[in-house]
Swiss-Prot record:
The protein's name: Uncharacterized protein C140.04
Cysteines engaged in disulfide bonds, as pairs: none
Stretches with biased composition (Basic and acidic residues): 79-88
Species annotation: Schizosaccharomyces pombe (strain 972 / ATCC 24843)
Biological classification of the source: Eukaryota, Fungi, Dikarya, Ascomycota, Taphrinomycotina
One term under GO cellular component: nucleus
Compartments where found: Nucleus
Amino acid sequence: MNVGKKSEIQVSAKSNLNFLNELIEEKKRYEDEKRKISHQKYTDKLLEANDNETTKRKLLVKQKRKSNKEFQSNIIKKRKDEERKGTLKTEQANEEELLQRSRLELERKAKKYDQYAAGELEIKETEDDGILVDFTRKWAEEAPENETVEITDEFGRTRSVSIYETGNTLLSQKEEYKPEKPIYGDYMPSFEVDEEKVQKLWKEDEQQAVHYDSTKEVRNKGTAFYQFSFDEKEREEQLLSLKEIHAKVTQQQRKNTEDVLTLRDKKLEERRKFLERDYAIKLGERWMSEHFSNN
């Protein structure tokens, strides 16, 4: 046996064929996988491109609609501005035309009046009515047909009557009025004041002034503000009702306070008992440790 030579591996032809078949199948599998991955990537790119295209198309449609709305609104606004400007121009033109005609007419009349004043022209009878102003006729034309005034009749009522009826109404009142006790000559009337009546009136005023009236003041009222009635009977009923409500609220508050204090005392007592028991246990343990640990 020659040790220096390398040993060769004997491989059969069948094994080579099997290996080649497996290699070809593996290569084919690899190519198929690669082709599937490439196809999937290509499909994803196409879908992404379609999505982007759809999004772009939607954005373009949205922008186009927005621009169309803005364009239409601008057209409507521009049309309204033009109509308003045209209306203003027409009104200004009409006013200017009216002013121009009035100015020309006044200038013509002024020139004609100057000629009449200088004696260059004579006033004809046919022109008399058109030149001179008839102030009587002007006042009659401007005055209302049936002007009314306010008067107070014999019953104390304020009435609106025609100006032509005012004289008769006031005249009848003047004739009907006759004083009961006329005073003639140098005479100073005296008046005796009834003290009892005055005192009674003062007491009534003071009694009424005791009660506060919130309607006489202009100010902001609080949430719990309460206006009592000025009727004494109703006022007493309101006071009694408020006193009953106050008593109920006070009793409920006192009860709640007592319940809270009772609960607090109960908790303090339980805590005290717990501490005493705990202290007794610790004291017993310490006594036991001191006496039995030495033994």
